[in-house]
UniProtKB/Swiss-Prot annotation:
GO CC annotation: cytoplasm; ribonucleoprotein complex; ribosome
Protein name per UniProt: Large ribosomal subunit protein bL21
Pfam families linked to this entry: Ribosomal_L21p
Keywords: Ribonucleoprotein, Ribosomal protein, RNA-binding, rRNA-binding
InterPro entries the record matches: bL21-like (IPR028909), bL21-like_sf (IPR036164), Ribosomal_bL21 (IPR001787), Ribosomal_bL21_CS (IPR018258)
A Gene Ontology molecular function term of the record: rRNA binding
One annotated GO biological process: translation
Protein source organism: Blochmanniella pennsylvanica (strain BPEN)
Gene label: rplU
Function as written in the Swiss-Prot or TrEMBL entry: This protein binds to 23S rRNA in the presence of protein L20.
Domain of life according to the entry: Bacteria
Transmembrane segments: none
Length: 105
């Protein structure tokens, strides 16, 4: 059984027990979070497709960690002008573990 859900501006395909990195959710480590924007659930019996979301479906996940991604280096450069600008960025993300995928018919 797998599901596709949307959080932030991205979509993720998950199965129960999977650990994934998503955009930052402002909750503490150890809390559970529920996702209601489910686009698709594929169980062994049948396939449920939302339009755009499945109304009676939900995904429950546990927050494992809040951390920062690797640093991205940004360099701006203009030739022959002796202009160089260096900047870095570290994106925040949340690591979650999918506890259960539920759907009521």
């Amino acid at each position: 059984m797998y599901a596709v859900f949307q959080t932030g501006s991205k979509q993720y395909r998950v199965v129960e027990g999977q650990v994934i990195h998503i955009e930052r959710i402002d909750l503490e480590v150890g809390n559970q979070v529920e996702f209601n924007q489910i686009l698709l659930i594929d169980s062994n019996e049948c396939l449920h497709i939302g339009s755009p979301f499945i109304k009676k479906g939900r995904i429950i996940a546990e927050i494992i960690a809040q951390s920062l991604n690797q640093k991205i280096k940004i360099i701006k450069f203009r030739r022959r002008k002796h202009f160089r600008k260096f900047q870095g960025h570290r994106q925040c993300f949340t690591t979650i573990k999918i506890v259960s995928i539920k759907h009521k018919h």
